[in-house]
């Protein structure tokens, strides 16, 4: 039987060319796959060696304070890390393999955090180079000074202090950028805890996390300070700060009873003068009937006062409001007794807890033959201003002058701190602000915005209307008992259909 056309075509169809094409396609895929792997791995290895050389060069340059060379090396390391990161894209399939995948992901995270951290460090070195220029200009004056970590801010003559502060002030944007990038690096490193990696790897990463965390904390504090340096230090014009020593052993809504206050005058980056006094010394002059300011009703009910005195000014739990009240009441009392009314540009409130932390860093201070240590600071100071002054033959009105002497001594110590100890001091400031042991207020609107954005102002927000309750404690005539009391507060909100 004859075959038809279709059968004939089917039987004669060749099969070898199809197989050959299949093998060719598979071969091309293998070649491309191998090439991509070799290219990706080669790029990663090359970049790793290059980055290692750059990092080693940066460390060596930093050891000799050659900031420009260090910055060049850091820039090279950043580019190498970016090259390695792009190399990973060619072998991305490795990330889907069991066990190996976690290490692949860790490499991505480390490179991302390294790039963020490197870019932050690059910007910091830009500032260091500018500061180095100021130091070079002062070379003749500072001939006997070595800038090696034992170097202190107090070493500089006033004109060079001012120039250094101006550099920081003008570079505040770079400091903010560095802080942001360090936080990004910190966030990337935190992702590693979710991966299944070796303990040895985690130990090494832990060290890196600690360094990045310390740097991030430093720049989170330094950046707003730099932006507000004119308000802080009087770079362009003299500034005067009202210091409120808030005794948290006698709690008030604004932080603590104001037993002592101070006026700190700053001019061109230097402390011009600091005056510290007992609040009762000014309050006693307005006890006459001619002076009257309506006090908050609880002060009348529980303390029996007939007017609002400066010592009770911080009644509001909103630190900005209590600062405004403190400024107003102090100025009114000065005016009433015929004394020059102080122009106040800002308020710094701090509790004894801040002093304890600072002493824990710099060590004990001896003032008027009395040793103040971090563990016993509050008790010793309390004893001296309530009892000990009598044994030393000091009058009642002068019993708190020791606080002024203590502040003078403390400022001398802080300005003499080696540069390499500044990050620890910034850490104390950061923790004290977060714990609300320290608060800041400025009469300048722009500066106050900086404080608010940084979380330093401790304002009571009224933006949210879903939470209308606030707990604010106040010690009303119970003396200095809060230091020994423990509190437990249960704050619970239940929602219903309405």
Per-segment meaning from a language model:
Residues 2-15, 22-29, 39-498:
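Non-catalytic, solvent-exposed segments at the cell envelope interface
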Residues 33-36:
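Hydrophobic secretory-pathway targeting helix
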